[in-house]
Design a protein with these regions (language model features):
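Non-catalytic cap/lid and distal C-terminal segments of serine-dependent acyl enzymes
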Residues: 1-163
Length: 163
């Protein structure tokens, strides 16, 4: 994060180590996944693509095209400034999921399983289709599901059961 607490580092480096030390959890990637919806879906894919050896990931109604999200006023009342500062274009950076996915594949890095789900009435639906098509064209191990529904918790809870 540009400002505030560094939640990404906490999730990326500290939380899994802590949990594996206090609970009988597997350290294997195939036994661990991280899931989130909306910006949390973005974060789950970013964590998995930044640390492909650690997690599989599920993204429910996720912000998969961070540039679209920054350039359009798609979510009233939400400010990405604490996360990205004054950035208006994150293409080709470690914040861009398209870039991270392609970089990993180009480098021959073994990627985790990715699960992507979205409602067909979600305002992020077209972006999710764009990411799905991009990932599948790169032969990424991506499973995509869609269901009728909007960008709300009712759909998120329904889709979470399938993860």
């Amino acid at each position: 994060m540009k400002y505030g607490h560094d939640y990404f580092t906490f999730m990326q480096k500290e939380l899994k180590i802590f949990l594996c030390n206090i609970l009988p959890l597997s350290n294997k990637r195939e036994d661990n996944f991280i899931a989130g919806h909306s910006m949390g879906g973005y974060g789950s894919f970013k964590l998995a693509l930044t640390n492909p050896e650690l997690y599989a990931a599920a993204c429910i109604s996720g912000v998969v095209d961070i540039n679209y999200f920054l350039q359009k006023d798609v979510q009233k009342g939400f400010s990405a400034k604490p996360i990205f500062g004054d950035a208006t274009n994150l293409s080709g950076t470690d914040h861009d999921l398209f870039y991270l996915l392609k970089e990993n594949i180009d480098k021959g890095i073994s990627l985790p399983k990715l699960y992507q789900m979205c409602g067909t009435e979600d305002y992020l639906y077209e972006d999710n289709l764009k990411f799905r098509d991009f990932a599948l064209n790169l032969n990424a191990d991506l499973e995509y599901k869609e269901s009728s529904g909007d960008h709300d918790f009712e759909l998120h809870l329904q889709l979470l059961d399938t993860v």
